[in-house]
Amino acid sequence: MAEFVEADNAEAIIARIETKSRKIESLLKQYKHVEALKTALEGSPPKTRDERCKSANWIVVHRALMAIKDIDGMLNALDVEYYDILMKYLYRGLSTGDRPTCDQCLKIHEKLTERAGLGCILRCLTDTINTV
């Protein structure tokens, strides 16, 4: 079972997410969109139940997701170990109801499902411990 940190450590997690956010912004300015997404997905989801941490991390992942233009190229460059966590964030994006976010998440979802198969969806939906 995953070990979760207590809420009093949430500030430390948020500080790490802020550092990650600055790195991602730098990568995006250099047009390294896939590298930014990989960086955003690293260490995700945060090992906490604190919603502030999860929301802060979602904002970082969302920023990287929205910058992706070449979905096939992104999936070719992305290691398969990232597929399940990416799928979780796609569902989080779909749950926002924001039209541009949903459109992007659906495009990526379609290509990711073709690549990773239905097992990726099932693992994402049945993992109730490591939520994003």
Curated annotation (Swiss-Prot):
Gene Ontology molecular functions? actin binding
Q: PTM N-acetylalanine: at which residues?
A: A2
Q: Does the keyword ATP-binding apply?
A: no
Main localisation, per the record?
A: cytoplasm
Q: Does the keyword Nucleus apply?
A: no
Where can this protein be found?
Cytoplasm, Cytoskeleton; Cell projection
Cellular component terms, GO, for this chain's entry?
Answer: Arp2/3 protein complex; cell projection; cytoplasm
Q: What are the record keywords, sorted?
A: Acetylation, Actin-binding, Cell projection, Cytoplasm, Cytoskeleton
Task: Choose any GO biological process term that the UniProt entry carries and state it.
Answer: Arp2/3 complex-mediated actin nucleation
Gene inactivation effect: Distorted trichomes and altered epidermal cell types.
Family the entry assigns: Belongs to the ARPC5 family.
Q: What does this protein do?
A: Functions as a component of the Arp2/3 complex which is involved in regulation of actin polymerization and together with an activating nucleation-promoting factor (NPF) mediates the formation of branched actin networks. Arp2/3 complex plays a critical role in the control of cell morphogenesis via the modulation of cell polarity development.
Subunit text: Component of the Arp2/3 complex composed of ARP2, ARP3, ARPC1/p41-ARC, ARPC2/p34-ARC, ARPC3/p21-ARC, ARPC4/p20-ARC and ARPC5/p16-ARC.
Q: What is this protein called?
A: Actin-related protein 2/3 complex subunit 5A
- Origin species, per record, is Arabidopsis thaliana (Mouse-ear cress)
